[in-house]
Amino acid sequence: MKKQTQSLIICSTILALLVSILILLISMPNSEITDTSTSESVSIPEAFISKKIEDISKIQIKNLENEVNIVANKNEGNIEFTIPELASKNVSKTNVEDFVKEILNMSPIQVVQENVDDLSTYGLNGDVPSISVFDDSGGKVVLKLGAEAPLSMGNYLRINDEHKVYLISPFYAELFKKFNKSII
């Protein structure tokens, strides 16, 4: 009986200690979340294309095999994306719209290097796969896919003719490579 009482007292003490630690942790302000103005290293990457889906007029995808255009047909507030080159095939409209959304949401993992002089280091010289996004106001953003990064971390990417190189995830890199298979 004495041993059971002793075990009960020890367990109760441990439980009380854990509850007090929990209360302390809950009541403490989380400085990492609430004070983001002082932390410059923590940032949420923004999408490369700052347009809404309603503002897009055309997306042109070029890879080493072929070129495909996704055209926005706008009628009374409704948008439907079509692919003229694949008009004879049964293309899923939902898949095409999802593909467009994925392109518009594409964001970098990180900036690899700014002021790059030798683009060949990143596989961004010559003919490379690209995605050009055209908007209704005549604007154009060209995303150029470079070589695969070490350790399969993703691929290098360049925007327009900037001398800045980004790293994108393998998921986004696939949008440049197998677009026609993923849409159908």
Where do the PLM segments sit?
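A short-motif feature that recognizes glycine-rich, charge-decorated loops
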Residues: 1-184
